[in-house]
Amino acid sequence: MVRLKDIALQAHVSSATVSRILNRDDSLSVTEETRERVLRIAEELGYQPSAKRRKPRGYGRDSAPLIGVVSCLSPEEERQDPYFSAIRKGVEDECFKQEIFITSSIHLGSFQEHIFHELDGVIVIGSLHDEALTSISGTFKHAVFINSTPNPARHDSVSADFYAAAQQAIEHLLSLGYERLGYIGGQEKEHTVKNGVNSKRTIEDKRLTAFLKTARPQPDHVKIGEYSMHEGYRLMKESIAGGTLPDAFFIASDSMAIGALKALQEAGLQVPRDTAIVSFNGIEEAEFASTPLTTVKVYTEEMGRTGVKLLLDRVNGRTIPLTVTLPTSLIVRQSCGS
């Protein structure tokens, strides 16, 4: 059994500090780096807190439910991805508000190494392939999926309509008079586990589907890599080297767009004078990019909070599965020229 002392030794803090961080004591004055280090070590060690909990506000059970969080991303991937880290923050904030401690927080690759029989339910962040979905469904009575909608006749889910949101962004560019549009994006992945190894497969990316249907681009104006800032930089350099630059780009994540901006600046090109950009996700950094980004705002923290509420409703007796699709907003800034 992992003790607070074990976490404290690895994190180089006191056991009291570990306890207060794990219990979300907002009166504790520590750096964000220390807090994240303690939470990461606790997760990596598989720390299991006491099952004694206070009843969440507004729910009828005598004790609070025991819930877990399963992330399809590795710890490193999640830390580097503002989109998914914001979803987790929403989950954690709502659990704190409801006075619930997340009993288990694990990543898909280590799923089979944990014991879950005492949990009332889990929140799954990300997209699962059939095998992993079957494993989750067979292990937990209640599961809520965030950022995917598997089997809506059985499971609750929270997501955003990426197709409609992307279409709105592309139509905004077209309405401004841009005719030749380019696309920079990554690959949408589904996750599964085989023999304890986390593997992925590429699935349809609704943002790309919307772009191809709405913009009807030239094939060489569509650049696909991985969802990262570095890949956005690389793919924009590739576009610049190709000769004729599109009038405007729809870039499928803010992080990729920030990388793309750097490539354009290095080439002496200005946004939106030489090419315009609309991106996706609405992370905080988009507002403070070298050219503030017009972006589709996805309410990721609210997705996390809603997932917790749905799970509590399920545990409290609701039997009808709910599919929640949150709205998005187009935040217009300097990068699109309007």
Which role does the model predict for each range below?
Residues Y59-E171, S175, A241, S255:
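Alpha-helical recognition/docking segments in bacterial nutrient-uptake
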Residues S74-S85, I106-S110, V158-Q168, I184-K237, ...:
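Hinge/beta->alpha junction and helix N-cap segments in small-molecule ligand-binding domains
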Residues E179-R180, Q218-P219, V271-A276:
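Short acidic capping loops at alpha-helix termini that bridge into adjacent secondary structure
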Residues M1-Y59:
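N-terminal helix-turn-helix DNA-binding module of bacterial transcription factors
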Residues F116-I125, G182-G185, V222-K223, G243-S253, ...:
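Periplasmic-binding protein-like
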Residues S14, Q48, P65, D120, ...:
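Short acidic/polar active-site loop segments enriched in Thr and Asp
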Residues K237-S338:
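Flexible loop/turn connectors
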